[in-house]
């Protein structure tokens, strides 16, 4: 069997890790052992935060809706209850966007929700 020299393969693998570690501070960008650990940890954070992002944005939309319905004399939970009773099926992301960009349309929805609660 012929001898296999691994220099080219090792260099390619290291290059791949260094490319991912570009922009890191200190030895984390140019020492293979620390760069590999840093890149692995970054991947763990990225995986975790892709899940967390969904929760964070939903919480943001809820906070925006709570602030938007307060002038109409309602809280967020009362508003959502009114929406379900009135049969309006719009998700929180769209409602939040309406509250910011289309206040008149959001006001109409809020009034319908309030009317459904009164009935």
Swiss-Prot record:
GO terms for biological process: ribosomal large subunit assembly; translation. It holds the Pfam family Ribosomal_L20. One of its GO terms (cellular component) is ribonucleoprotein complex. It comes from the Bacteria. Keywords: Ribonucleoprotein, Ribosomal protein, RNA-binding, rRNA-binding. Signal peptide: none annotated. GO terms for molecular function: rRNA binding; structural constituent of ribosome. CDD domains: Ribosomal_L20 (cd07026). InterPro entries: Ribosomal_bL20 (IPR005813), RIBOSOMAL_L20_CS (IPR049946), Ribosomal_protein_bL20_C (IPR035566). Belongs to the bacterial ribosomal protein bL20 family. NCBIfam families: rplT_bact (TIGR01032). Binds directly to 23S ribosomal RNA and is necessary for the in vitro assembly process of the 50S ribosomal subunit. It is not involved in the protein synthesizing functions of that subunit. This is Large ribosomal subunit protein bL20. It comes from Rhodopseudomonas palustris (strain TIE-1).
